[in-house]
Swiss-Prot record:
It holds the Pfam family Pro_isomerase. It comes from the Eukaryota. This is Peptidyl-prolyl cis-trans isomerase CYP26-1. Keywords: Chaperone, Glycoprotein, Isomerase, Membrane, Rotamase, Transmembrane, Transmembrane helix. Its main location: membrane. It is an enzyme of class 5 (isomerase). The lineage of its organism: Eukaryota, Viridiplantae, Streptophyta, Embryophyta, Tracheophyta. Its EC number is 5.2.1.8. It comes from Arabidopsis thaliana (Mouse-ear cress). The gene is CYP26-1. PPIases accelerate the folding of proteins. It catalyzes the cis-trans isomerization of proline imidic peptide bonds in oligopeptides.
């Protein structure tokens, strides 16, 4: 079974910036990867403090250009995600496979780091590697250029995970595209004040449906020709 993939839709200063896609190494760090996946989907619901246990709406608190991004600080008042914190899983994966390597902070709770360069032995054995950014590194580098960090490593403009979730298959990508198309249609409709109508619809299980459609057209044409010849 293929490793799961999750996504972050980012905004910079409230404006859509783009999407990054992350492959989780569930085959090697199953518990920690599953923990991260659940935080992306928000399936754990609301925590004891009344806050969603979800990366959606959270910010990247620290961004060091060409070094690392730190995010995921969503646990309030040391509220655990599980009944107890996860033990550090496997350190068999290292940080030399960057850039784009993602690892969990020492607490193994919700905080994570995206490494923008090869770290090597500096953090190996301390942070559990759980995945890697497979799409969107160029986007992150462009954001680094736009967001000039302060001496405290805090971005000058808020970088927010506006939406996140799991990409289970190609249907998730279609939903993402349809969501953006839907927004565009709504905007155009509001401006033009014209209704959006589904002129026709149906299911095409395979190529036979197309053939049946063509056959029906041919039969209809033949019937019309017969009537025409009858009256003529």
């Amino acid at each position: 079974m293929a490793n799961p993939k999750v996504f972050f839709d980012l905004t910079v200063d409230g404006k859509p910036a783009g999407r990054i896609v992350i492959e989780l190494f569930a085959d090697l760090t199953p518990r920690t990867a599953e923990n991260f996946r659940g935080l992306c989907t928000g399936e754990r619901g609301i925590g004891k403090c009344g806050k969603p246990i979800h990366y959606k709406g959270s910010t990247f608190d620290h961004i060091v250009p060409d070094l690392m991004w730190c995010g995921g600080d969503i646990i309030f008042e040391n509220e655990p995600i599980h009944s107890e914190e996860l033990d550090d899983e496997y350190f068999i994966l290292n940080h030399e496979d960057g850039p784009g390597i993602i690892s969990m902070a020492d607490s193994n709770g919700s905080q994570f780091q995206i490494h923008m360069k090869d770290y090597g032995l500096q953090v190996d054995g301390d942070h559990v590697v759980i995945g890697k950014v497979v799409e969107g590194l160029d986007l992150m580098r462009n954001i680094e250029k736009e967001v000039i960090t302060t001496t405290t490593r805090t971005p000058s403009k808020p970088v927010v995970i506006a939406d996140c979730g799991e990409l289970s298959d190609y249907r998730s990508e279609r939903c993402y595209l349809m969501k953006n198309i839907e927004k565009e249609v709504i905007i155009k409709t509001a401006k033009d004040n014209k209704p959006v109508v589904i002129a026709d619809c149906g299911g095409l299980s395979d190529d036979r449906s197309e053939r049946y459609y063509l056959i029906n057209i041919v039969v209809a044409c033949m019937v019309l020709m017969c009537f025409w010849s009858w009256f003529v």
